[in-house]
Amino acid sequence: MSKSKILVGDVVKVIAGSHKGELGPITWISKDKKWVSVQGINSLKHVKPSQTDSEGGIKEVPSKINLSNVALQDPKNKDGISKVGYQIEDGKKVRIAKKSNSPLKKASK
């Protein structure tokens, strides 16, 4: 699989599924880069008890979303973007949205 341009902390827009149109920051990316977890979106409410966590009940546990169902949020025109480019500014490599040519905020963990 090709390298993903989405990083932990980036604000993404859900583009498919029951949460379509919702925004949130990424909290986790799987090692094989196929799944992401977005804060406040697609969370499980009912949790069954397991051997490690003997107490089940109603808890908010983040669930995963396929990477193909999210797009980076463009800071300038508030659309989901599909292409990320890079520019050198002051000797540093900066990520930009190719459509609006605006810099993407640095992802904070």
Swiss-Prot record:
Superkingdom of the source species: Bacteria
SMART domains attached to this UniProt entry: KOW
Gene Ontology cellular component annotations, sorted alphabetically: ribonucleoprotein complex; ribosome
Extent of the signal sequence: none
A Pfam family annotated for this UniProt entry: ribosomal_L24
GO biological process: translation
GO molecular function: rRNA binding; structural constituent of ribosome
CDD domains with a match to the protein in the record: KOW_RPL26
Family annotation (InterPro entries): KOW, Rib_uL2_dom2, Ribosomal_uL24, Ribosomal_uL24_CS, Ribosomal_uL24_KOW, Translation_prot_SH3-like_sf
Keyword Ribosomal protein: yes
Keywords of the record: Ribonucleoprotein, Ribosomal protein, RNA-binding, rRNA-binding
Subunit record text: Part of the 50S ribosomal subunit.
Membership in a protein family: Belongs to the universal ribosomal protein uL24 family.
HAMAP family tied to this protein: Ribosomal_uL24_B (MF_01326_B)
Physiological role: One of two assembly initiator proteins, it binds directly to the 5'-end of the 23S rRNA, where it nucleates assembly of the 50S subunit. One of the proteins that surrounds the polypeptide exit tunnel on the outside of the subunit.
Protein name: Large ribosomal subunit protein uL24
Gene from which this protein is expressed: rplX
